[in-house]
Regions:
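Short, conserved active-site entrance elements at the starts or edges of catalytic domains
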Residues: 2-28, 131-170
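Charged, gly/pro-rich active-site loop segments
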Residues: 2-4, 9, 68-144, 216-289
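Short beta-strand segments
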Residues: 16-62, 156-190, 205-209, 217-220
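Short coil-to-beta transition motif at edge beta-strands of beta-rich domains
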Residues: 21-23, 65-72, 155, 198-204
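Short histidine-centered beta-strand/loop micro-motifs
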Residues: 60, 85, 170, 186-188, ...
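Short secondary-structure boundary/capping segments
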Residues: 150-151, 196, 266-268
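Short alpha-helical
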Residues: 193
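Helix-adjacent hinge/juxtasegments
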Residues: 196-200, 205-219, 226
Length: 289
């Protein structure tokens, strides 16, 4: 019997603009058992097709050689819930020249929160991933507080979070975030790839900046994360509500989409809640190529 679920997934062709002219783009890879995330510039090999065209990806100078490594290239836009879109391809990087790689899409995933809809799920759908979780009050080291990190956390609204699986497969996703007690909090599903990866390998890399298309400044943050079952503490929830829903400039957008709220609540209710708690260790300024 078919089961109806709410999905954010769309055809890659529906996000053609993210492929043809990405507002910001990033690359994630496992570089010798270390997760790496970099700002990149991306163009499509001619004839340009948003789905099948190889991506020509340029990375900043001074980074590890990515030739013949499996990579993830992600483009995203929109700090508001109903405008948050992402187009992700996975493939192998082939060297073309200095700091430039050709990536043929082996897998492509597109999602658009503004296009939530009900779809039928065929029988035999895989069981959701099961991950181990940390205790909500688990002790960790004191977080880092460099001035450039404080500025990035204050000025950014969507971070790129990169993680790696136990087998070394890189994964990257744009996420909302808030800070509390010197740590970075992000909500997600308990069955998400991010939760599974963090449980297997706590090291993460974050990329901030670039939400303004004209801004080439970025901040690369390295640290470690833990996955906690359930919603964040009330103080964190309040910060999320204020930062993304209740501020006047965002409350207006929310009210314009009030008819979609019920669908959004059903989408959230389909999976168990979890949140990621990130402790920063280093912060390095860089520029998009």
């Amino acid at each position: 019997m078919l089961q109806l679920v709410i999905t954010r997934d769309v055809e890659a062709s529906a996000l053609a603009d993210l492929a043809l002219s990405p507002p910001r783009a990033a690359l994630a890879a496992d570089a010798d058992e270390e997760i790496l995330v970099l700002p990149v510039s991306v163009t499509l090999e001619e004839p340009a097709d948003p789905v099948s065209s190889p991506r020509i990806v340029r990375v900043p100078d001074g980074n590890p050689d990515l030739a013949d490594r499996n990579v993830v290239v992600i483009a995203d836009d929109g700090p508001q819930w109903f405008r948050l879109r992402s187009l992700t391809i996975r493939g192998m990087a082939k060297a073309m020249g200095e700091c430039t790689y050709r990536v043929v899409p082996r897998r492509i995933v597109a999602w658009d929160y503004g296009s939530l809809r009900e779809v039928a799920t065929p029988p035999g759908k895989p069981t959701p991933r099961q991950a181990s979780f940390s205790a909500a009050d688990e002790h960790d080291d004191h977080p880092l507080h460099p001035p450039n990190l404080e500025a990035a956390l204050r000025n950014s609204r969507v971070m790129i979070l990169a993680s790696r699986s136990r087998r070394g497969t890189a994964f990257a996703v744009p996420l909302w975030f808030v800070t509390h007690g010197g740590r970075i909090y992000a909500t997600t599903s308990a069955s998400s790839w991010t939760v599974g990866n963090v449980a297997a390998s706590p090291q993460v890399a974050l990329l901030f900046g670039g939400e303004d298309r004209a801004d080439v400044n970025r901040l690369l943050v390295r640290g470690y994360a833990r996955a906690v079952r359930g919603v964040p503490p009330p103080t964190v929830l309040a910060r999320i509500a204020w930062r993304y829903y209740l501020k006047p400039e965002f409350a207006t957008a929310e009210l314009k989409h009030i008819r979609q709220w019920a669908l959004r609540m059903r989408y959230y209710g389909q999976s168990q809640a979890a949140h990621i708690v990130i402790t920063a260790q280093t912060a390095t300024a860089c520029r998009a190529p």
